[in-house]
Each structure stands twice: as C-alpha cells, then as structure tokens.
Amino acid sequence: MYRTAASRARALKGVLTRSLRPARYASSSAVAETSSSTPAYLSWLSGGSRAALTSLDMPLQGVSLPPPLADKVEPSKLQITTLPNGLKIASETTPNPAASIGLYVDCGSIYEAPYFHGATHLLERMAFKSTLNRTHFRLVREIEAIGGNTSASASREQMSYTIDALKTYVPEMVEVLIDSVRNPAFLDWEVNEELRKMKVEIAELAKNPMGFLLEAIHSAGYSGPLASPLYAPESALDRLNGELLEEFMTENFTAARMVLAASGVEHEELLKVAEPLTSDLPNVPPQLAPKSQYVGGDFRQHTGGEATHFAVAFEVPGWNNEKEAVTATVLQMLMGGGGSFSAGGPGKGMHSWLYRRVLNEYQEVQSCTAFTSIFNDTGLFGIYGCSSPQFAAKAIELAAKELKDVAGGKVNQAHLDRAKAATKSAVLMNLESRMIAAEDIGRQILTYGERKPVDQFLKSVDQLTLKDIADFTSKVISKPLTMGSFGDVLAVPSYDTISSKFR
C-alpha cells in the first residue's frame, strides 16, 4: 500500500513538473495536444481514470478576460469648458480605473475681513458634513458605498474639496461633491463640535515649532491680508458660527471663482453631470485679490526649554512671475537640509548644500532646512533651524553665511544639476498621483486661467544657469529680513545684528 502511494506521488511530481514548465509560444494545435495528453491527477489520486486536464494557457469557462492593454497610450489632453455663469469645468482622461474630482475656489484667509478671521479654517473642518439634502450619516454611507475618499484643505489664497473613487461612480461623486460645497447645513451641534476640535488643534500648533514659526513670519513679514492668520485665532472661536460661515460663503463662493477639475474622467461625461448642478450659481464678476505689502519684521516668543528654533526669510516673486518662482523652487531644492536624525535611513538628502555644510559639520545644529511659501504675487524663501540655546547665534550666522556663499557663486555645476534633477523628478512623481494631477489642474486654472504644460516647467528648470541662481539669491537677501524665533530666545541676537549678517 505505501509502495503504491509512493509510486503515485512520484508520478504526480513528474506531472506537476511537466505542467509547470513554460511553453515557448505553443501553437493552438500544440496546446490542444498538450491538453489531451495531460493527466487529470486529482481524479487519478481519488481512484478515477486518467482524463484530460485543461492547460493553464487556456481561459477558464465562464471567466471573461480583461481587455488587453494598448500597445501605445496617447498622452491625456486637458479640456476646459466655461459655463455662462463663469464656472470652469476641466478634465483629462487617463487609463486609470479610478478618478479624482475636486472643486477649487479662489477663496482663502486673505479674503477674511477682521470679523471673518478663522472662517476658512472652520470651513475646511466643516467640509462633507450635513447638507440641506443629506444628513452627515447618510453622506458618509453614500461615500462608503462607492469606496470613495474625501478631503478638504484651506490655504491663504485658495480652498479645495476633493473626492476620489472608481470612475464608474463619476455621477455619484460629482453630485455628492457639489451638494457638500453648495448646500452645507451648518447645524449648530456640528459647528460647535468642530470649534472644540479647532481649539485643540490651535493648542497643538504651539507644540510644532516649525509650523508655528512659518505661520508667525507671515504675520511679521507682511502688511495686509497675507498677515492674517491661516489658523483661527483662539479669540475668534467664540464668535464663529453657522450664520457667519453662510455670509462668508455667499460673498466668496461665486461661479467665476470656482473650477471643477477632474483627472481620469471623460470631459463630456463630467460636463453632462456637473452643468445642471452648477449652472444656477450666481454670475458675479470675480473679486480682485486684496493686495499685501512685504515689509519684513521680527517675531519672538520665549517659552524656555532646551532648544532655540529660528527662521530667517526674504520676499521672492510669486507664481505670476513664473521664471523667478521656478528659480526659488530649484534654490530650495539645492539648499535642501533636514534633521540631524533621518527617519528614512542614512544618506537621505545628504548631498544637499545645508546637509553637507551645516548638519554634517556642526553637531549642535539639530535641524536646518530651506523652505518656500509662494503665492500668486509674492512669496517667502528662507531657512528654518534648531539648535541648543548656546549655539543659536552661531546657527543663525551659519544660515546667513550659506546664503551669502550661494549668492557669491560658490555653487558648482554638479550641485545645480543635482538640484534641477531633484526638482523635475519631484514634480513628475507627484503628477503620477491622480489626486495631485486634479489639484494641479484646478489651482493652475485659478491662477493662470489655463494649465501650463509640464514640459514648459521642465524646460524652465533646464534653462537655469549658475549665474541665474547666484543673481537671484543676491537679489533676495538684499531685501528686508523677516525673522522668527521660538523656545529659549534669550541668546538670539537683535534683528539689526542678524540683518547685517546678510549684507
């Protein structure tokens, strides 16, 4: 008996070996012959007779094959339609099975009058809550039913509401998205719940020194709307309510200031679904964005502790000056930086200017990184750092020295080529995400009225020279300094002393 079982096992092993050996472009007749000669070993082991076993090269009965991939996929083309009321609908098709759709509004904290401070922050948190047509529970269940994912974000100049799901659910996605933006109910208990969460969020901001300083230098560096807080001031939480949000939306959420953008959706399908839902939005001429003036300034908050956090920044042109905004982006990538401890493993970012010349040389510096905050007409470029209080003055001096060295032409071609390659790869990798692609469409149309081809951006990066980087940096650091410090700031030099380091 055992001998018989072993014999069958050895025979089965031979069958499996022959069955799993790949056929080299077998013809249909050869496949048929192979199928008829292959033993049905499962039946054989159970005592049945040898029968034909269907080849793995043949499709199973009742199972349809997916459509074959095209040999060549044409680049997606963007289509834009402007409705009579001024709202723009834009989309590009992709071979992805999923789609991302967003409603982008030319509205942010710069449009907040003092009475409305914190409105955009609260609107962001009230996104996809109860509407006049749906309870929050029903809305969540409908999004879950289509496997959707929603998000909202608010910035100083723009707001976005997005939804992501399989493209077979485009009608449902568009309807839920537009209902959530156009018809919020602003129920008192939902508003009060989000206000309580905002209070916690504001308290947590003080525990994030870099985020806190980046917010503070806008208030110190600008005069006008850009100095308004992006996060709601704690003093405004008692004043914010549903009626105030409705008033703010009525003033700012008009058709001419909205773009419905999608990635992975046929334009005609999107237009067919969205036009009836948005054509009755009021046709109001777009409001001119309020202007801000860069003035420079100093912000300090002493909280004690064992570290000093600082940020030094200067004004740079905004996205409407495309060449110089691109130069600022490449300069940020060239300067790079990071923390003394890299959570992503050793070697990450270590070829950047600040990493090689500051973090690797001075153990007292815990963090040193370049940053940008660019808007339509203006922006900030600077360096954030963190060190021990005793080393704070030296760390700030090092930040000034490195910017002066770049302005003095000490960057070589290898440094610039690495920064340009990193900039281009970051943009191209981000655009592989359909959600980022939809966001790019919406925000560019709000800014430029069109979407500029990515090749144009890449060409602008390629055209930058060492002289461009040096001249740009020299011009930037000649402007008034904006300075911020947080933590143990007792040893931080005066504003005039720091400003003189850049001259």
Curated annotation (Swiss-Prot):
Matches recorded under InterPro entries: Metalloenz_LuxS/M16 (IPR011249), MPP/UQCRC_Complex (IPR050361), Pept_M16_N (IPR011765), Pept_M16_Zn_BS (IPR001431), Peptidase_M16_C (IPR007863)
The organism's place on the tree of life at top rank: Eukaryota
This protein's UniProt keywords: Membrane, Mitochondrion, Mitochondrion inner membrane, Transit peptide
Record keyword Ion transport present: no
Membrane topology: Peripheral membrane protein
Presence of keyword Plastid: no
UniProt GO cellular component terms: mitochondrial inner membrane; mitochondrial matrix; mitochondrion; nucleus; plant-type vacuole
Transit peptide interval: 1-59
One Pfam family it belongs to: Peptidase_M16
Subcellular location: Mitochondrion matrix; Mitochondrion inner membrane
UniProt-recorded Gene Ontology molecular function terms: ATP binding; metal ion binding; metalloendopeptidase activity
One annotated GO biological process: proteolysis
Function: Substrate recognition and binding subunit of the essential mitochondrial processing protease (MPP), which cleaves the mitochondrial sequence off newly imported precursors proteins. Component of the ubiquinol-cytochrome c oxidoreductase, a multisubunit transmembrane complex that is part of the mitochondrial electron transport chain which drives oxidative phosphorylation.
Family assignment from sequence similarity: Belongs to the peptidase M16 family.
PANTHER family noted in UniProt: METALLOPROTEASE, MITOCHONDRIAL-PROCESSING PEPTIDASE SUBUNIT ALPHA-1, MITOCHONDRIAL-RELATED
Assembly mode: Heterodimer of alpha and beta subunits, forming the mitochondrial processing protease (MPP) in which subunit alpha is involved in substrate recognition and binding and subunit beta is the catalytic subunit. Component of the ubiquinol-cytochrome c oxidoreductase (cytochrome b-c1 complex, complex III, CIII), a multisubunit enzyme composed of 10 subunits.
Protein name as catalogued: Probable mitochondrial-processing peptidase subunit alpha-1, mitochondrial
Lineage: Eukaryota, Viridiplantae, Streptophyta, Embryophyta, Tracheophyta
